[in-house]
C-alpha cells in the first residue's frame, strides 16, 4: 500500500485557495496583480522555508521542529482595558516620551511590539478615513485597541521572549499598579489629556519606576521570566542576530504604532508612506525607532524616535 503523502498545513491550503479565487476574479472584479503577488510570495516563503515558518497553529495542524531548533513565529494580541479605565492614557504610558518606553520594551524583550486597533492613530480624522477605505492593511482599525507582540526565534527562545514581553507590558496596562493614577483617582480627578498614566497626570514613571517583584496571580514576576529567558537561551544552539529574527521581507498592517525593520541597521524610523500628520514608516503608522539594547546580541542602529 502506497504511503499517504504528507498533508499540507491548513494555512497553506487556504492560501492556495485564496490565490485561485483571486485569479478567477482578476478579470471580473479588477483584482490587483499585487494582491496575487503577495499571496503567491507567502506560499513560496512557507513552502521553501526561505524565512522563519509562520504557519499559525490555529487548528492544531502546525508543529514545531524542536530537535533542529527551527525558528518559529509567535503572535500574541492583547486587548487594552479601556472600558474599565476610560481616563487612563494607555498610549502615552506604553509609548513614553518620544517612544522611548516602547523602544526600551522591545530592546529588553527582543520582540516586535505594535499598538493597533481603533484609537491607535494620533490623527483621528485620518484614522476614520483609512478605516472606511476598505484597504485590508487598515482592517485592524475596526478592531478594539490592542497590542500585538511578535517573537521570532527557536521554539524555546521564542516562547521565553514572548513570556518576558507579556510580563513587562502588563505593568504598563495595569492602572492599579500605577501610584500616580491611583493617587489622582482617589482625589476624584476629572478626565484630562497628557502623557502620564492618568490623562493629564504626571509623566510616565520611566525605567526606574518599573519595579520588579510585584507579580500577580501567584507568578513571581518579571525576575522569574527573565531567568527563564536566560535558561532557554543557554539551552539552545541558536546564534542570535541583531534583527531578532525579522528580515527585510517583514511587513504588516497600516496605521497604529509600530517599528519597521530596516535590515541589519535594526529598528529605525523610516520616512515615506506614513498615514496622517507626523506619521512615518512603510506601513502607514507612527513608527518608533529600534536600537541597541541591554543584551549583547542587540546591536541594531539607534535610529530616531518619532514623537507621539
Swiss-Prot record:
Protein origin, superkingdom: Eukaryota
PROSITE patterns hit by this protein: KH_TYPE_1
Keywords noted in UniProt: Methylation, Ribonucleoprotein, RNA-binding
Domain KH: start-end pairs: 83-118
Name of the protein this chain belongs to: Glycine-rich protein GRP33
Biological process according to GO: regulation of alternative mRNA splicing, via spliceosome
Positions with biased composition (Gly residues): 203-220, 273-294
Modification(s) after translation: The arginines in the Gly-rich domain might be methylated.
Disordered: annotated segments: 203-222, 270-308
GO terms under cellular component: nucleus; ribonucleoprotein complex
Listed SMART domains: KH
Amino acid at each position: 500500500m502506497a504511503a499517504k503523502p504528507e498533508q499540507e498545513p491548513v494555512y497553506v491550503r487556504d492560501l492556495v485557495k485564496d490565490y485561485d479565487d483571486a485569479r478567477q476574479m482578476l478579470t471580473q472584479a479588477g483584482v490587483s496583480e499585487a494582491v496575487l503577488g503577495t499571496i503567491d510570495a507567502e506560499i513560496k516563503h512557507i513552502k521553501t522555508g526561505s524565512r522563519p515558518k509562520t504557519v499559525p497553529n490555529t487548528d492544531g495542524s502546525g508543529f514545531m521542529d524542536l530537535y533542529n531548533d527551527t525558528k518559529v513565529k509567535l503572535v500574541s494580541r492583547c486587548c487594552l482595558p479601556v472600558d474599565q479605565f476610560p481616563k487612563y492614557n494607555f498610549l502615552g504610558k506604553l509609548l513614553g516620551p518620544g517612544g522611548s518606553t516602547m523602544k526600551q520594551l522591545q530592546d529588553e524583550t527582543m520582540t516586535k511590539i505594535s499598538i493597533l486597533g481603533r484609537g491607535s492613530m494620533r490623527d483621528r480624522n485620518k484614522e476614520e478615513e483609512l478605516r472606511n477605505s476598505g484597504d485590508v492593511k487598515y482592517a485592524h482599525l475596526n478592531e478594539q485597541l490592542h497590542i500585538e507582540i511578535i517573537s521570532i526565534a527557536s521554539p524555546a527562545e521564542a516562547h521565553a521572549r514572548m513570556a518576558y514581553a507579556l510580563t513587562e507590558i502588563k505593568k504598563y496596562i495595569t492602572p492599579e499598579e500605577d501610584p500616580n493614577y491611583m493617587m489622582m483617582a482617589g482625589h476624584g480627578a476629572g478626565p484630562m489629556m497628557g502623557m502620564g498614566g492618568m490623562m493629564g497626570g504626571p509623566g510616565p514613571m520611566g525605567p526606574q519606576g518599573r519595579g520588579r517583584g510585584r507579580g500577580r496571580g501567584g507568578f513571581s514576576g518579571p525576575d522569574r521570566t527573565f531567568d527563564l529567558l536566560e535558561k532557554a537561551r543557554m539551552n539552545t544552539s541558536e546564534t542570535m542576530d541583531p534583527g531578532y529574527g525579522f528580515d527585510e521581507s517583514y511587513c504588516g498592517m497600516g496605521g497604529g504604532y509600530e517599528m519597521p525593520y530596516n535590515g541589519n541597521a535594526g529598528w529605525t524610523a523610516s520616512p515615506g508612506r506614513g498615514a496622517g500628520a507626523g506619521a512615518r514608516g512603510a506601513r502607514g503608522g507612527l513608527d518608533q525607532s529600534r536600537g541597541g539594547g541591554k543584551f549583547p546580541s542587540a546591536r541594531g542602529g539607534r535610529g530616531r524616535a518619532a514623537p507621539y
